[in-house]
C-alpha cells in the first residue's frame, strides 16, 4: 500500500519471519505487568529513538501501556498522526478488585491525555467499550472507529467432521480467573457428578504478569482430581478446534476475542456469558447460547443441551461459520483497518 513499516516490539523467535515481509524490526525490552516510572521513561526514550531512526510520520500502537508511552513519545517527537487499537479494556476496567478501583480514575485521566489531538484516532472492537469511553469522557465519538476484531483466517480455521466419540468441551483462553476458569471448572464438576460423559479441557497458558492469573499448582490440582484436563499453551489452535465439540467461554469481559472468532470459523457452537465482546460474536439460539453473567445453572444447562444434541451442535456451528465469512474474515477486517491510515 506504499507504507514503509517499522515494528517496535520485544524481539522473539518470529523476528526473521516478520522481516521477510519487508518490515523492519527494532527491539523494545517491554514488559506488560508491573513496571515503574523508570521503566516507563525508558520505554518512551526507546520509542522516540525508533521514531527518529525510522523517520515515522504515523504512530500505531496496540494495548493500554504501549498507547500511553507511544502517544507521549510521538508528541515529544512532533508526530501528530496517531492511531491506537484497544482489543479490550483490561484488568483495570473489568475487575472489581480494590487495586483496580484505585488505579482506574488515574488511568482515565492518563488516557484522556494520551488520546488528545484531532489527528489521534482510537479503534475499539465493540460497542460497549465505545460507550464506556464516551461515558468517562476519555475521547470524542468522532475520533472512535469501531472495527470488530482483528480478523480470522477462514482457510486455516474451517469446519471438520464432528467426531462421534467422546464429547470434548474446551475453554480456549489464558488461565485467568476473569476468563471464567473457575466457572468452567465448576460446570465440569457438576455435569460429571450428574453422570455426563465428556472431556472438559482448559487450553491456554498461565500469565504470571496478570493479577488474575490462576496458579500452575491449582491447575495441576484440578487435573489430578480428574475434574478437567489442562492442555497448556497450544500453537496450533486449528488442530485443537478440530478435536473439539463445544466451546465454553464464561469470560467476564472481552474486546472481541479472537479465540471465539476462530472457533466460530471452525464450525463450533459457543456458550458464553452475555458480556461485552462475546455478544458481538454469539447470537443467542443461533450460533450458540448467551448466558446471564455468572448464572452457573444456565451455563450448565446450555452445555448439557448441546452435549445431548449433535444436530444442534452442527447447525449452530454452520451458522457461526457463515457469520464469520460475512463479517469477520481477515480480508474484511484488514481492509477496514487499512482505511483508517
Map each language-model feature to its residues.
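Donor nucleotide-sugar binding/catalytic pocket of nucleotide-sugar-dependent glycosyltransferases
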Residues: 26-29, 105-159, 168-171
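Glycosyltransferase donor-sugar binding loop
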Residues: 8-13, 172, 199-214
